[in-house]
Amino acid sequence: MSIASVASVFKGEHAVGSKVTVRGWVRTRRDSKAGISFLAVYDGSCFNPIQGVVPNSLDNYDNEVLKLTAGCSVVMTGDVVESPGAGQAFELQVTDIEVAGWVDDPDTYPMAAKRHSIEHLRELAHLRPRTNIIGAVARVRNCLSQAIHRFYHEEGFIWVSTPLITASDCEGAGEMFRVSTLDMENLPRTEAGKVDYDKDFFGKEAFLTVSGQLNAETYACALSKVYTFGPTFRAENSNTSRHLAEFWMVEPEVAFANLNDIAGLAEAMLKYAFNAVLTERMDDLTFFAQHVDKTVIDRLQSFVSSDFAQVDYTDAVEILQNCGRTFEFPVSWGIDLSSEHERYLAEEHFKAPVVVKNYPKDIKAFYMRLNDDGKTVAAMDVLAPGIGEIIGGSQREERLDVLDMRLAEMDLNQEDYWWYRDMRRYGTVPHAGFGLGFERLVSYVTGVNNIRDVIPFPRAPRTANF
């Protein structure tokens, strides 16, 4: 006898007639007049539950099996047999079943058989992974994570763990969470009446990071190809389906690379990850196609078979101005493209993923390399049909004098970036990288539109439960 996951049984890894033990939770119980109960038991290893056929000859049939309800946990041992019913190849002829945990009151169990709205499930984040939709999201999220790590490993990248606590504002936007151990009821003050951060834990102001990029750049300038994959934080008071206060970012940095190099890297990474999901998680994708967004499978297959289009920002603005479409936000050179502009370019004009390059410097961050025209920077966004921007990146400014000029233009203090400036003083090198918002990627793959539903415990304005 061996411990088996539901997925391993369905994959045929256990011979017909072999005895296995499956451990999981009851989704449904159905009783027949012939004295047999049919239990649908899931363990999270795949989308479908396995059917356990339980005879009334078991000693605990009357006093336990017939009392099982949705959510009860069981340890079920039996023989693997071919299933006569449609929908699954194998089932379990149960010879022994142990109840590991009961549901106290089945009538009030929040995850009972009735369907809940996805909005309601957010209020039950500790129980929602038991539902079909959130369980499927979790498996797809894991598949994408593993594929991204695998991709960078195969490409010779080194994974760098960048700090979550920082004194630098990577984006220069100031929307950062402060980290402090000072007594909020009795703050120390300077003679000028300002908060005295010399008395704080780090002896200075500290924040939760908005990006691991600046730290990753230092490692790229020694190890050539690195990436970060971890949580980042934005204190942006946005209550929308596209914003979280805590989210995960994938950020590669490559030495001796330019904008075209990382555009190619972004394309290769996305196609690798999408192919992994199409290969490994078709059961979950089929569910999403049936119940969430019927286009998800076709969209991913189309994405991996499409060549990325490329267009300069200036040309993209001209396309949008001359397309005959009236947009909610009018288009003019110098504005940041909105979601409706991005989706028009990807879905209607190019009908493919598109890389928009060379944005106006005034709407981009200080670290992006200034182009020879003095007006634009070597920045790029990858726009995907169905969602818009999915990746943002740039060639980094490797020239110290130009970097200092950009810091001054954006009213940022050189002293706060002394270590970042050092990289331009000691063997500077052209380098480039990008950031991928991981939750936005999961949303794109699953068709689940609100990114609060593709992260286990969402953090947003006035939302920090669990």
UniProtKB/Swiss-Prot annotation:
- Name the domain of life: Bacteria
Keyword annotations: Aminoacyl-tRNA synthetase, ATP-binding, Cytoplasm, Ligase, Nucleotide-binding, Protein biosynthesis
UniProt keyword annotation of ATP-binding present: yes
List the GO biological process terms: asparaginyl-tRNA aminoacylation
Does this UniProt record's set of keywords contain RNA-binding?
no
State its Enzyme Commission number(s): 6.1.1.22
- Record Pfam families: tRNA-synt_2, tRNA_anti-codon
Q: Name one GO cellular component term.
A: cytoplasm
Looking up InterPro entries in the UniProt record yields: Aa-tRNA-synt_II (IPR004364), aa-tRNA-synth_II (IPR006195), aa-tRNA-synth_II/BPL/LPL (IPR045864), Asn-tRNA-ligase (IPR004522), Asp/Asn-tRNA-synth_IIb (IPR002312), NA-bd_OB-fold (IPR012340), NA-bd_OB_tRNA (IPR004365)
Catalyses: tRNA(Asn) + L-asparagine + ATP = L-asparaginyl-tRNA(Asn) + AMP + diphosphate + H(+)
Q: What is this protein called?
A: Asparagine--tRNA ligase
Q: Provide the species name.
A: Shewanella baltica (strain OS185)
